Amino acid sequence: MLPRRILLGAVLGVLTGAGHAASPSFDCKRAEGQIEQMICKDDTLAKLDKETTRLYGLALDARSMSTSRKKTLLAEQRGWIKGRNDCWKASDARACTTAEYIDRIHLLRQNFAGPRTQDAKGITRGPFSVRCPGADALILATFVQTEPGYAYLTWLDKKLLLSQTRAASGARYAATTDAGEAMFWDKGPEAQLELPGKPAMTCRVEAPE
């Protein structure tokens, strides 16, 4: 499950319409438990599942990865799936599952080179380096191109998941946390970041290597 310190914003614009075109990486006829069944009925969650599996496969296929590291990655993925399926215990199972997927996507992209090599085939980008004068540390940002889209920011031991909202220009993301409102407005090489209890910061966004 996600660390307790995650600042999980309220998921905005939840999709509940009919006509789910996407399908997850697993066979929905064999879906087990509440979470897998929910994923099969939810277009956004199905896309997140397929993207997570794609990135995991790219990480696992790296020729330079040692046998012991592959075993560790396999164990980590099994543990993550168990944690995702435990989201049935959460007060908002969908928000929990969404956050689990995006956190896993971020970690796969951050920790392995393979998942960053075929972005044209997926729906995620990053992690980008976000440098903000006045911030506690360097911020890493991963972006997810679903409907709605998401921005996932991590720094030190903090994590913040924001949902995309309407904007006249650029890409604006917002979240409601226990501490207050948060906002990240990506305008190309620059972005504006607002965190609860702190003044707005103008940041520079740098593409991953």
Where in this protein do the model-derived segments appear?
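N-terminal signal peptide c-region/cleavage motif recognized by signal peptidases
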Residues: 16-19
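Bacterial N-terminal signal peptides that target proteins for export
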Residues: 1-10
